């Protein structure tokens, strides 16, 4: 879990991330990478990771938001159903940028027959050094229902 200046977790579903006053705050949103990290997806994975690297380096974001389908544990396309390995490889890749990131799951991150369900995948992602993620409250359906409040230095919510 990310732990840096201007960041704190209030409870199981609420985070605060302070926005610096002296400059624009950049949020990069990426979706549908469909990384397979398997025998059949090597070329496509390299192209996707190269594109992600290029856009991160060009934009220098303060926060990256992944909106589903980061990984794709589908045997005919990736050559593997091991989404645990896929998630761990993705985390190693994205953590090297040293930029906080968050995510929501898509319909392909936990394909039927994949090694891990959303609960287990959530545990894996919370181990990311720069990941801001929570499973959320148990009384709300789904995994990954949480808030990131972007605030000023007085914790007034800006966005």
What is each model feature region?
Residues 2-15, 85-159:
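Extended active-site neighborhood of metal-dependent phosphoesterases/phosphodiesterases
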């Amino acid at each position: 879990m990310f732990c840096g200046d201007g960041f704190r977790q209030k409870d199981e579903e609420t985070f605060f991330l302070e926005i610096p006053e002296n400059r624009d705050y950049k949020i990069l949103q990426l979706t549908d990478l469909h990384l397979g990290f398997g025998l059949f997806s090597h070329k496509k994975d390299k192209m996707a990771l190269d594109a992600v690297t290029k856009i991160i380096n060009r934009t220098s974001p303060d926060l990256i938001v992944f909106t589903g389908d980061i990984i794709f544990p589908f045997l005919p396309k990736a050559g593997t159903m091991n989404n645990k390995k896929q998630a761990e490889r993705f985390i190693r890749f994205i953590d090297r940028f040293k930029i906080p990131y968050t995510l929501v799951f898509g319909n392909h991150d936990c394909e039927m027959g994949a090694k891990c369900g959303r609960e287990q995948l959530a545990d894996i992602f919370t181990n990311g050094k720069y990941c801001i993620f929570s499973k959320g409250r148990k009384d709300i359906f789904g995994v990954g229902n949480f808030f990131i409040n972007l605030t000023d230095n007085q914790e007034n919510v800006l966005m």
